[in-house]
């Protein structure tokens, strides 16, 4: 079996909660908006972030990686003071959920981010006050720089993005979808030279991420631990479920992420 150019080892961030182990276990059908996804189990993806403006409009996802840091996509253009990190959300139509709404003190975008090529599409958000871990809020593990993943491994992406490439219908409940990973070479067969070594591709098998999922997680399970291997970045405008979606390859940025956290 081919290997994606990336050994799955973990960078532990956080407190005694550790990382990547939800208190509430996810339930996956692996059968098939996200597009062609399904409702997640309440609280089963505790690192999922909703990025919102002051009106409560959800515009991007993100992943909690420690009590003070969230990782998202650079193209989400998060502005401290104008945008907020919302933790613990599941049903966006509910006003009764135990949410944590946190201000952003700093948004640190990778210095080589290119909005034309979408290369290096990653931003770190420092929270103005630390998140409080609960059964519904805890961090994900980061893939390390020497990550290796087998082709065809099924991973999961989550979010509240559009349910279809047509129209603007978004779900109330957090969606999840299992997606197979594809190699860089396979992805380049569809996207050509747009795919760089700093990207990872998944999907093309009847399901996809879509607009509004941007910045959110692509996670794979190792044993009982979930590891963040991708950040939702880009794909077809109509969210074609037969085309692989493109994610920022977290392993290429784990050293930079840890350096930013250490010095800020």
Curated annotation (Swiss-Prot):
Chain ranges of the Peptidase S1 domain: 34-262
- Tell me which PROSITE patterns the record gives: TRYPSIN_DOM (PS50240), TRYPSIN_HIS (PS00134), TRYPSIN_SER (PS00135)
Gene Ontology cellular component terms for the protein in this record: extracellular space
Query: What are the UniProt keywords, alphabetically?
Result: Disulfide bond, Glycoprotein, Hydrolase, Protease, Serine protease, Signal, Zymogen
Which positions make up the signal peptide? 1-18
Catalytic residue positions: 75 (charge relay system), 121 (charge relay system), 214 (charge relay system)
GO aspect biological process, one term: proteolysis
Q: Any chance you could tell me the propeptide residue ranges? A: 19-33
Membrane-spanning intervals of the chain: none
- Report the EC number(s), separated by commas if there are several: 3.4.21.-
| A GO term, aspect molecular function | serine-type endopeptidase activity
Q: Would you list which residues are glycosylated? A: 114
Sequence similarity: Belongs to the peptidase S1 family.
Q: What is this protein called?
A: Chymotrypsin-like protease CTRL-1
Gene that produces this protein:
CTRL
């Amino acid at each position: 079996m081919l290997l994606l150019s990336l050994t799955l080892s973990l960078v532990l961030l956080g407190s005694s909660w550790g990382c990547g182990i939800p208190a509430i276990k996810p339930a996956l059908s692996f059968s098939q908006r996200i597009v062609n996804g399904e409702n997640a189990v309440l609280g089963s993806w505790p690192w999922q972030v909703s990025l919102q403006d002051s009106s409560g409009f959800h515009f991007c996802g993100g992943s909690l990686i420690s009590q003070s840091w969230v990782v998202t996509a650079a193209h989400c253009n998060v502005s401290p003071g104008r945008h907020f990190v919302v933790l613990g959300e599941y049903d966006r139509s509910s006003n009764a959920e135990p949410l944590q709404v946190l201000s952003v003190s700093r948004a640190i975008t990778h210095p080589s981010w290119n909005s034309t090529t979408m290369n290096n599409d990653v931003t770190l958000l420092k929270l103005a006050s630390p998140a409080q871990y609960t059964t519904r809020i805890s961090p994900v593990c980061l893939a390390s720089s020497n990550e290796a993943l087998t082709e065809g491994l099924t991973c999961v992406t989550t979010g509240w993005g559009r349910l279809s490439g047509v129209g603007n219908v978004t779900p109330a409940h957090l969606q999840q979808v299992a997606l197979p990973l594809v190699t860089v070479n396979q992805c380049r067969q569809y996207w050509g030279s747009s795919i760089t070594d700093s990207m990872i591709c998944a999907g093309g098998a009847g399901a996809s991420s879509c607009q509004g999922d941007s910045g959110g997680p692509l996670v794979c399970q190792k044993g009982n631990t979930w590891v963040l291997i991708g950040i939702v970045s880009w794909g077809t405008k109509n969210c074609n479920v037969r085309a692989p979606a493109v994610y920022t390859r977290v392993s290429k940025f784990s050293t930079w992420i840890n350096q930013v956290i250490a010095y800020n």
